[in-house]
């Protein structure tokens, strides 16, 4: 499936987990709130029933925060991991004219996912091919990545970033609740309840 968002992403050094705060907005007018994270909570919405759910990550404690980081944060952490890790990896950088193609192959005993920092997933009760592959396409003109591909044995995902505008605001001016619709019922997120098409 294909999903399109307008994303406002802020580097957030105070957040030691993801390292970024962000909101996903609908592409029709760039105003409809879809999802948000502010370094402390993630905010999910169901427009059909006018409901907001807030997850402060305490109901179901995990060693990572279960959300997909925004594009540039994700790419930055892939590169940082490749430069700093002592894991078994193979990297290649191909000059493709107007862009570079970077490929990272992780040969560990378990798959590696990025929730901000890299996290070695626990082995499942059945065999899963553990190789993890990440690829980045990087513009030479501005040094920014514009495409990311993640390949696991069970799933392949691709994310493309276009029409980039450099954010001139600072993180101290970001409030995720400024983007949340007014008049919606607010509830605490329940991991045991059906999601009912909550945007994430």
Predicted regions and their residues:
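Hydrophobic/aromatic beta-strand elements that line small-molecule binding cavities or substrate pockets
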Residues: 2-11, 33-34, 132-138, 159-165
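An acidic-aromatic
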Residues: 6-70, 155-157
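Short, hydrophobic/aromatic-rich segments at coil-to-beta transitions
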Residues: 14-23, 96-103, 119-122, 142-148
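Short solvent-exposed loop/turn micro-motifs enriched in small/polar/acidic residues
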Residues: 26-29, 84-86, 128-131
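A short, structured loop/turn motif at beta-sheet edges
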Residues: 90-100, 137-144, 166-168
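Short helix-loop boundary/capping segments
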Residues: 92-131
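Non-transmembrane domains of secretory- and envelope-associated proteins
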Residues: 121-133, 141-200
């Amino acid at each position: 499936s294909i999903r399109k968002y307008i994303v406002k992403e802020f580097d957030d050094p105070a957040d030691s987990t993801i390292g970024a705060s962000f909101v996903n907005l609908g592409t029709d007018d760039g105003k409809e709130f879809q999802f948000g994270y502010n370094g402390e909570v993630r905010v999910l919405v169901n427009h059909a029933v006018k409901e907001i759910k807030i997850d402060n990550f305490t109901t179901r404690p995990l060693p990572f925060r279960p959300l997909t980081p925004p594009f540039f944060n994700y790419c930055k952490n892939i590169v940082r991991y490749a430069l700093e890790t002592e894991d078994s990896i193979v990297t290649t950088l191909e000059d493709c004219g107007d862009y570079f193609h970077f490929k990272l192959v992780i040969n560990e005993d378990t798959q590696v996912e990025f929730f901000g920092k890299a996290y070695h997933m626990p082995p499942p009760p059945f065999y899963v091919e553990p190789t993890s592959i990440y690829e980045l396409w990087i513009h030479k003109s501005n040094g920014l990545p514009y495409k990311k591909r993640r390949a696991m044995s069970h799933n392949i995902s691709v994310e493309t970033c276009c029409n980039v505008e450099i954010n001139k605001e600072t993180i101290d001016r970001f409030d995720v609740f400024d983007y949340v619709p007014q008049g919606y019922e607010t509830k605490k997120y329940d991991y045991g309840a059906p999601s009912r098409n909550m945007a994430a």
